[in-house]
């Protein structure tokens, strides 16, 4: 069978889309890094994108890209919305990938990470240490889990299935603390509460880009919620080989080009992966590291764009029987 090369070609000049709901520090950082690399960024909100009908059926509609596709699509953020809105936004990303546009991170990765139950499953399947977790629709089943764990003095954390930055978390130490189904959108995501003990509320955020841990920070929480958005103090941290390898393996388990991996240590000293974020913010991390995170992200993003023309040509030749 004839094989064709997928070696990276020279970076073409052109424009790339950056999906972001509103301009912020991250968009300025990404924009500067893209311009420095010779790429013109076009910032779009998903609210202004969609699919447009015509004589040929339905086609992808991206403002400013009526005549050509973007070289690539960097997904900085997907704003909260209804189930239908989020489905449409992910559909746009799926369509871009089907059209051969490199999407960073693509819809498949975002779907795996935004749904905490899928993340937990993939981490477990990859053999990575992660806290025991239950995802249930039945209130009776959730109450049975809480009773069993409470009887063994193992508190649980109730998390929104979709959510980030520590919002909506609740510590469940007994059955009375479990809210009704309508308060959790009909799904109970329950995870073992992990603590080092002695009132030490801390965890680590490791930033992985292109399969490599490039920066990390230690977060000291004012409570058991250790997110920077919840007031945690962040400081520079140099992860050892074990933590680096764990973070890199977690990003690989979900297929992420870049990811923020949250790691915690239990009372026995074992490291556990709590979550993998496919659209992580990095402003807090940038304040405590010398690594130019936006430039590293853009370099990895552009390497995927450079590979795309050869990959598309190879696929076309294969379909043609060449």
Residue locations for each model-derived region?
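Glycine-rich phosphate/pyrophosphate-binding beta-alpha loops
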Residues: 277-290
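Extreme N-terminal starter segment of soluble prokaryotic enzymes
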Residues: 12-17
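Conserved N-proximal alpha/beta basic substrate-recognition cap immediately N-terminal to
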Residues: 21-132
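A long amphipathic alpha-helix within ATP-dependent nucleotide-binding catalytic cores
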Residues: 224-273, 294-312, 319-321
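Rossmann-like NAD(P)H-binding beta-loop-alpha module
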Residues: 129-153
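Protein kinase-like catalytic core scaffold
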Residues: 156, 214-215, 259, 272-274
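Phosphate-binding site of ATP-dependent enzymes
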Residues: 165-251
């Amino acid at each position: 069978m004839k094989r064709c090369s997928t070696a990276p070609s020279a970076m073409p000049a052109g424009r790339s889309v950056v999906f972001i709901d509103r301009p912020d520090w991250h968009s300025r950082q990404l924009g500067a890094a893209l311009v420095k690399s010779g790429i013109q960024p076009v910032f779009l909100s998903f609210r202004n994108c969609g699919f447009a009908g015509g004589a040929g059926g339905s086609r992808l509609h991206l403002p400013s890209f009526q005549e050509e596709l973007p070289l690539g699509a960097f997904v900085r953020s997907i704003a909260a919305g209804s189930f239908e809105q989020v489905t449409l936004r992910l559909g746009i990303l799926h369509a871009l990938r089907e059209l051969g546009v490199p999407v960073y991170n693509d819809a498949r990765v975002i779907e795996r990470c935004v749904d905490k139950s899928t993340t937990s499953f993939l981490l477990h399947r990859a053999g990575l240490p992660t806290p025991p977790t239950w995802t249930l629709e039945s209130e009776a089943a959730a109450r049975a889990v809480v009773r069993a764990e409470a009887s063994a003095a193992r508190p649980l954390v109730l998390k929104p299935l979709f959510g980030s930055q520590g919002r909506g978390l609740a510590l469940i130490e007994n059955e009375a603390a479990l809210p009704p189904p309508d308060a959790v959108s009909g799904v109970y995501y329950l995870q073992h509460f992990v603590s080092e003990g002695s009132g030490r509320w801390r965890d680590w955020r490791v930033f992985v880009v292109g399969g490599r841990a490039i920066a990390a920070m230690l977060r000291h929480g004012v409570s058991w919620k250790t997110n920077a958005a919840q007031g945690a103090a962040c400081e520079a941290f140099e992860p050892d080989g074990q933590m680096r390898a764990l973070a890199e393996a977690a990003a690989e388990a979900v297929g992420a080009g870049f990811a923020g991996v949250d790691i915690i240590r239990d009372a026995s000293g074992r490291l556990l992966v709590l979550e993998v974020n496919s659209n992580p913010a990095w402003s807090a991390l940038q304040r405590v590291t010398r690594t130019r995170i936006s430039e590293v992200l853009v370099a990895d993003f552009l390497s995927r764009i450079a590979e795309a023309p050869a990959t598309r040509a190879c696929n076309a030749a294969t379909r043609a029987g060449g």
